[in-house]
């Protein structure tokens, strides 16, 4: 059994100013066998990179297309790869929805 809640560390600057490298996120799994993920446009998600399945990415779910979710970086100037490079991401690759950033407690 996989836990419904898990944690992920942000590794890149692609989601600044909302999230920064070193931030820790609490994530709720969206994959329930037999059910599509319950997501809305604007939510931050953790997904498997379509071209590198062992790599997790943190992106904003921009819209749902016929091929899956269009995932976008908040900071495209950081050079991060998102759906502009790899297209829509199938729902099966969306691992979870970010509930909150729990570390650091405050930014100074």
Which residues make up each language-model segment?
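Extended hydrophobic leader/signal-anchor segments used for secretion and membrane insertion
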Residues: 1-108
């Amino acid at each position: 059994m996989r836990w419904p809640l898990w944690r992920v560390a942000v590794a890149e600057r692609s989601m600044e100013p909302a999230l920064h490298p070193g931030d820790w996120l609490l994530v709720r799994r969206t994959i329930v066998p037999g059910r599509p993920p319950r997501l809305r446009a604007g939510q931050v998600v953790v997904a498997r990179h379509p071209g590198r399945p062992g790599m997790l990415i943190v992106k904003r779910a921009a819209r749902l297309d016929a091929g899956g979710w269009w995932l976008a970086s908040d900071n495209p100037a950081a050079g991060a790869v998102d759906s502009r490079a790899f297209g829509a991401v199938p729902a099966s690759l969306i691992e979870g929805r970010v509930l909150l950033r729990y570390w650091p407690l405050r930014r100074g």
